[in-house]
Amino acid sequence: MASLSGPISPINLEMFKPGVEELNPSKLLLLSNHQEGMLYPTILGSLELLSFKRERSLNLQRDKVCLLHQESQLLKLRGTGTDTTDVPLKQPMATSVNCCHDGIFTILEQDRMPKTSMAPTLTESTGSLVTRLMSIPRLTFSIGTQVAMRLFRLGFRLARYSLRVTILKAQEGLLLIPDLLHAHPVEPLVQDRAVEPILAIEPLPLV
């Protein structure tokens, strides 16, 4: 204690310096490896440090690739009428190989379009449709009757013969209607109307 009261020499100062142990570079590398949660070879040298930096930069590049890929998809769909609403979903996407499979990805959610049936729709009621179908034969018969009367008045024998054959075939069809109703009961237009009694048509003269 007596030596402390006198002048302090440089040698005494060195005695009071706290002992600081120099850290080995290999120990520093081990500490950094434990902090990152990854195990790397602890070979001392500049190559190992470069590989460690390259691994961290590769992870950052993967994140950038994922973001750029999603942004490019949004830019492509913009202006085409597609909804570009971003919905964050926690699920992996297989759109890019370089993207990480853990994290939040943005997926485009398109509006659900209502499915339209391709079946033809009836724009007319059944009653109006039946009325139109029944008016067509009446118009045809009236025109045919007028043409037949003109041909008979002119005296063309061949025309009169062809018209007579057509009329006979029509009469035969009218006579067969009751039998056709029993054989084909799925025709709604014929079933809705009662079968009227067929009047005997006078034979046309072949003069």
Swiss-Prot record:
Q: Which UniProt keywords apply?
A: Virion
Q: Which InterPro entries match?
A: Corona_nucI (IPR004876), N2-like_embe-CoV (IPR044311)
Where is it mostly found?
virion
Q: Which domain of life is it from?
A: Viruses
GO CC: one term?
virion component
Q: Where is the signal peptide?
A: none
Q: What does this protein do?
A: Structural protein that is not essential for the viral replication either in tissue culture or in its natural host.
**Family named by the database record:** Belongs to the coronavirus I protein family.
Q: What else is known?
A: The gene encoding this protein is included within the N gene (alternative ORF).
Q: Kindly provide the name given to this protein in its UniProt entry.
A: Protein I
Q: Native species of this protein?
A: Bovine coronavirus (strain 98TXSF-110-LUN)
